[in-house]
Every structure is written in structure tokens, then in C-alpha cells.
Amino acid sequence: MTSSETTTDHPRTGKCPIDHSKFARSNEANPDAYINGIKKDQQSSSWWNSLWSRNTDVASEPDVAMLHKKPSTVDTHDHPLANPPPGCPMHKASNENSTGFFSNLFGREKQNSEATPAVQPPATCPMSNSNQKPAGVSEVLTGVDSKQQSYVPEGCPVATPKRGWFNWFGNNDDQKQEAYEVDKSNMMYKNIPQTAVDDQVVGLETTRTTSSIPKVDGKNWEYPSPQQMYNAMWRKGYRDSGENVPIMVQVHNFLNEGAWSEIKAWEREAGENTEPKLLRFEGNANKRTPRALWYMMLGRINPNRWGSGEGPFDRHDWYVQRKDNSIVRYVIDYYEAPDSADGKPVFSLDVRPAVDSFESVALRWKHWRAMRQMQQQ
């Protein structure tokens, strides 16, 4: 999301444009007016439009701030829900002593793999796969009493059976079975268990939330339920009580929706009425993009301007199908930015079309030139 308050080009810097305190106040005044962070009397599209449009008075905002910094002349609208917190199967901590939002949220370390063999979870959610810091997973959660767990659903559009931390489309209720039935058309698992695992302490919701992200079959992708999230984590060897899982789901959904909003902004630049739909997605946290490597190098040279140089905590590739059936691959790097002034976690997404075709290269060049012109004004 390109914020009018952002002063640099790097995706890790800038201020969060969301007034988080306003949501908390409005929700305290009328706690029954929201479901999973969305007003009951508002349509999803209009809510997201107001949330992510510039200079718009926001009626409800997430507790987790997300800063999208994409060099673009197009404002990002309709930012709905989207990555996962510590201990989350979508991101694996490479440093046991790492700190930050995700690590604090899901603080316990993984049990010894010899004592409890980790089972490979499915993969299909836009926020999966990572051998970096643990990442947060969730849509837009806020204003909900932590004792009441506000749960968000499943079916997230990102990850792959090969590399994903969890695929929200598995087809097996046996939690100890590693094999899942895969849909060959999109390489996604068909289903994933909703049953509680052995020794699970906290009861988790099994309801799934429908995203704003369209599929090629005319339906919309669905996000994972808290129980499915926990099951995926359990397969990877995490043994937390599960009380933080609902928040993970919300962060995850929140970031995914933001990523899709950025993609739609790019598609508007590509031409009118491309009618983009998410065909499939991959989690490629272990594959650094040239752009991410460049930012990491700049961060080590000048951390005050470019951040710490740690690099993104996750990377996804989303395959978007247009109405003419052409397919465009988008690359998304997920960064954890410094917390906001009031202590809220802030995330930055660097979303852009991959340089797979001359058209994508031309689009990025056009985008870069427009951004430079705006900076010079």
C-alpha cells in the first residue's frame, strides 16, 4: 500500500496510515457491530475500499498494521485481509533466539524432532513457507476481547504441496498421515482436517472465512480456520497451547488481502477490465529475489534508510489469470517493519509482476517512471 506519509522507496520504511485506536474505541462502544473485524452492515468490498483508500476516514481497522510500499502511481484500494506469526507453520524460525512480533506471539520453541517427529503439513495459503523468522498469520483482527477468540476461516490462496508449510486443501482426517490428495489442476490439497489433535488444550473454531480473492471457477478462495492452522503447526512439531492461533489466522488473512489489493492495482495499470483471478500460488521463502538481495545489501550499507538488511521473512509467487486466459506471475516479498508509535506490528509487502515477459518488464518500467515523476513534483 502506498501511503501518502511514506518518505522512502523501500518497502520496510514508512508510517502506517491506519488509526488503530479508532477501531478499538468504536468496537468498545458497540462490540456486537463487528464480525472478524468487519462491520455487520457493510459489504466486504466497500469496507476494504474505505480501509485502504488514501485519506479515508476508517470505521474499522486491524490491530495489526500493514504498510505496503510498492513503487506505484496507483493508490491501493480495497485492501482486505493477509502472513503468519511465530511458531506458525507458514514461517519457520531460522534463529531460535529471534525476537519480534511473531516470536513474542508464539514464544515456545519447537519440541525436539526426535521426540515428536514433525509431519509435513499441506500448502496452499498465500502466507506459507519460510525458513526465516516465524511469521504472523491473520486477516484483520481487532477490537475483539482476547478472551473471546475471534476466529477466522480457511482456504487461503497461497502455498504449494512441495514447499508450503500448510496447504489448506487436504483430504484426510487422520492427523498422522502425511499423504494428501492433491488437485492436479492447481497443485493444491483438496482438504485439510478440522479435528482437534491429541493433547490439544484450547478449543479452536472450525469456521472458515471467504476471502475477497476470486478463483478461476467463479468462487472465492477461503481462509483456514484456527483449528486447521493449529493442525498444520502441530504437523511441523510445534506444541503451543494454541491460544494465539486465532490471531495468527487474522494476521495471515490480513496480509493476503493486502497482497491481492496490490495485485489489482498493478492490473489496473496493465489495462482496463483485465478481471484478474488467482489461479494458484507458491511459497518460496528459501528463494531470494534479486530485488530482495539488493535491499538486503543496501540495508547493511545504510540501515537508517533501508532497514536492518535482514531481508523478507517470506516470499510468495501468485499466478494470476486474466479474462483473456493469459497468466501473469506476481512476486511478493513480506517484510516485518518497525512497530508503529503505539506498539502495533507493521508489515510491508513488496508486490510486483515477475519479469517473465516483455509486457511485465514494460509495466514495471512504466511504473518506475511514474513513481520518479511523482517524487520530483
Curated annotation (Swiss-Prot):
Q: Which organism is it from?
A: Schizosaccharomyces pombe (strain 972 / ATCC 24843) (Fission yeast)
Q: What does this protein do?
A: Lyase that catalyzes the covalent linking of the heme group to the cytochrome C apoprotein to produce the mature functional cytochrome.
Among the record's GO biological process terms, what is one? mitochondrion organization
User: Could you tell me where the Basic and acidic residues compositional bias lies?
Assistant: 7-22
| Protein's cellular compartments | Mitochondrion inner membrane; Mitochondrion intermembrane space
Q: What is this protein called?
A: Putative holocytochrome-c synthase
PANTHER family this protein is in? CYTOCHROME C1 HEME LYASE, HOLOCYTOCHROME-C SYNTHASE
Can the keyword Iron be found in this entry's annotation? yes
Lineage at the top is: Eukaryota, Fungi, Dikarya, Ascomycota, Taphrinomycotina
Give this protein's Gene Ontology molecular function annotations. Answer: holocytochrome-c synthase activity; metal ion binding
- Sorted UniProt keywords: Heme, Iron, Lyase, Membrane, Metal-binding, Mitochondrion, Mitochondrion inner membrane, Repeat
Which residue ranges contain the repeat HRM? 114-119, 124-129
Supply the enzyme class, top level. Answer: lyase
Region ranges (Disordered) = 1-29, 111-136
Pfam families xref list: Cyto_heme_lyase
For this record, an example GO cellular component is: mitochondrial intermembrane space
Q: Mainly resides where? A: mitochondrion
Task: Cite the EC number.
Answer: 4.4.1.17
